Curated annotation (Swiss-Prot):
Additional remarks: The PMEI region may act as an autoinhibitory domain and prevent untimely PME activity during transport.
Lineage: Eukaryota, Viridiplantae, Streptophyta, Embryophyta, Tracheophyta
Organism: Brassica napus
One BP annotation, GO: pectin catabolic process
Compartmental location: Secreted, Cell wall
Assigned protein family: In the N-terminal section; belongs to the PMEI family.
Disordered: annotated span: 246-267
Tissue: Pollen, and at much lower levels in pistils and petals.
Enzyme Commission identifier(s): 3.1.1.11
The protein's name in its UniProt record: Probable pectinesterase/pectinesterase inhibitor
Region of interest (Pectinesterase inhibitor), residue spans: 40-191
Glycosylation (residues): 91, 105
Pathway: Glycan metabolism; pectin degradation; 2-dehydro-3-deoxy-D-gluconate from pectin: step 1/5
Signal peptide as annotated in the record: 1-22
């Protein structure tokens, strides 16, 4: 017999969700020595929402003053409380800087200024979350995944602040000062994760929440492809964006030119801004072109950077969204700088980046990004992305330690080259790198190479982790002769729940037989998630792998790391000349 639609309210559905995750207890109302232990409706609602929170006590305390049992109102109240806590953390940071007065050194001032900036980013995202939620979660519907993504960013911005502080006393002071807002942000993620997970387990999609429908049988694979059109392209990318990425080959290049597949393509795109060192464009520097881009742009700011070496540090502010840069080739258009923690006073890891993308919707093609500080510069980032939905094709990233900082949001890289030594692909984002060349370099004497260092501090409630899919991991020409004596590893855990998957990748013999390494002085490897599947090459032999890494036996075990799942809701581009592989 066919199952009919069951129409319910959001409040009822959340109650059912509470039952599904085992948090609503029906108490016997009968009398007895124990008296009436029945919880009132408000307490039940709070208990239900807070059951999955990392800090249940803090969660309940936050919601106790809210005199309502409406889950929508409770969740919105929780978001407002989180916003208030982040505001206090921002004010605390400013007062800490003021309290240090003239005694503050350049590095402390730089890191506190950065803290203030990223905490403001967190506030802006919380404001967006509250606005998008509306008065009722029914208005959120299919935005639930996006709301959770923004919440992940709010949490990450606060960890960014602490991560950049190297001075121990200041790190302790700031850690304690923003602890409350970080806890509330963490709890908020847990609440959203519990709701979306429980609904998924009950075959309730987020769109059903919007429609008020429970119990419909979903279409096949809807959870993977619900945000793709009939051609397999992401709905969030406009027709103009798709054409831009298809057309943005190196101007005049043959169609087969490139680092790998999907090379040139004619360069028919019409830029809004042109940068040229010889004065033949509107601007001589990239930074000038970025400043000319509008804020909160519903369209695209398209910057064509002509061939040349541009020695400058470029920052794309958070409000300058939807920037698309393309050049004349990854070895022809090069953006380079040499700022580093080791050699540049007043510099932190986050501030060392040659190019720093703070905004959403960034796209790049046919550009080389370099940090030339060298191994003695220690942390020296070539490219850092903080914004959500970054799409990078046919680019090259060269550095030593911390080359590619995939710091926040959802990021997709295809057909790139990235080189480095220590933790040279690292961050706290959901990142997939496909069909790319990864090169370990020769660093300082005795230095060990680590390809990845993921910074997942939150666990499985968030999608934070690095996926290397169908790549090649090799030694560069300077390391080639010493590749068997210089130790190189696939990665090490930067944070307690570090997550990294290497799938369908050719691994050279430079990688140690153990595959993965521990973070010195920490036990993060005991809670980290490291997965390998269907790899090839001499370095892919898993016989001597560390016991805490998982060697997947079937595709089902790594399905969650596909583009369609890891970067949900499938927010990436599939183009004819540079295709996106949604599955394995």
């Amino acid at each position: 017999m066919a199952v009919g639609k069951i129409v319910i309210s959001v409040a009822s559905m959340l109650l059912v969700v509470g039952v599904a995750i085992g948090v609503v207890t029906f108490v016997n109302k009968g009398g007895g020595a124990g008296g009436d232990k029945t919880l009132n409706s408000h307490q039940k609602a709070v208990e239900s929402l807070c059951a999955s929170a990392t800090d249940k006590g803090s969660c309940a305390k936050t919601l106790d003053p809210v005199k309502s049992d409406d889950p929508s109102k409770l969740i919105k109240a929780f978001m407002l409380a989180t916003k208030d806590a982040v505001t206090k953390s921002t004010n605390f940071t400013a007062s800490t800087e003021e309290g240090m007065g003239k005694n503050i050194n350049a590095t402390s001032k730089a890191v506190l200024d950065y803290c203030k900036r990223v905490l403001m980013y967190a506030l802006e995202d919380l404001e967006t979350i509250v606005e998008e939620m509306g008065e009722d979660l029914q208005q959120s519907g299919s935005k639930m995944d996006q709301l959770k993504q923004w919440l992940t960013g709010v949490f990450n911005y606060q960890t960014d602040c602490i991560d950049d502080i190297e001075e121990s006393e200041l790190r302790k002071v700031m850690g304690e000062g923003i602890a409350h807002s970080k806890i509330l942000s963490s709890n908020a993620i847990d609440i959203f994760h519990a709701l979306t997970t429980a609904m998924s387990q009950m075959n309730v999609k987020v769109d059903d929440m919007k429609k008020g429908n429970l119990g419909e049988t979903p279409a096949p694979d809807r959870d993977l492809l619900e945000d793709l059109d009939q051609k397999g392209l992401p709905k969030w990318h406009s027709d103009k964006d798709r054409k831009l990425m298809a057309q943005a080959g190196r101007p005049g290049a043959p169609a087969d030119e490139g680092i790998g597949e999907g090379g040139g393509g004619g360069g028919k795109i019409k830029p809004t801004h042109v940068v040229a060192k010889d004065g033949s464009g509107q601007f001589k520097t990239i930074s000038e072109a970025v400043k000319a881009c509008p804020e909160k742009n519903p369209g695209r700011c398209i910057i064509y950077i002509k061939a040349g070496v541009y020695k400058e540090q470029v920052t794309i502010p958070k409000k300058v969204n939807n920037v698309f840069m393309f050049g004349d080739g990854a070895t022809q258009t090069i953006i380079t700088f040499d700022r580093s923690v080791g050699l540049s006073p007043g510099t932190t890891t986050s501030l060392s980046g040659t190019v720093q993308v703070e905004s959403e919707g960034f796209m790049a093609k046919w550009i080389g990004f370099q940090n030339t500080a060298g191994p003695l510069g220690h942390q020296a980032v070539a490219f850092r992305v903080n914004g959500d939905r970054a799409v990078i094709f046919n680019c090259r990233f060269d550095g030593y330690q911390d080359t590619l900082y995939v710091n926040n949001g959802r990021q997709f890289y295809r057909n790139i080259v990235v080189s480095g030594t220590v933790d040279f692909i690292f961050g706290k984002s959901a990142t997939v790198i496909q069909n790319s060349l990864i090169l370990c370099r020769k660093g300082s004497p005795g230095q060990t190479n680590h390809v990845t260092a993921d910074g997942n501090e939150k666990g499985k409630a968030v999608k934070i982790g690095i996926v290397l899919h169908n790549c090649r991991i090799m030694a560069d020409k300077e390391l080639e002769a010493d590749r068997l004596t210089v130790k190189s590893y696939l990665g090490r855990p930067w944070k307690p729940f570090a997550t990294t998957a290497v799938i369908g990748t050719e691994i050279g013999d430079l990688i140690q037989p153990t595959g993965w390494n521990e973070w010195q002085g920490e036990k993060f490897h005991l809670t980290a998630t490291y997965v390998e599947f269907n790899n090839r090459g001499p370095g892919a032999n898993t016989a001597a792998r560390v016991p805490w890494a998982k060697m997947a036996k079937s595709a089902a075990e790594v399905e969650r790391f596909t583009v369609a799942n890891w970067l949900t809701p499938a927010n990436w581009i599939q183009e004819a000349n540079v295709p996106v592989q949604l599955g394995l």
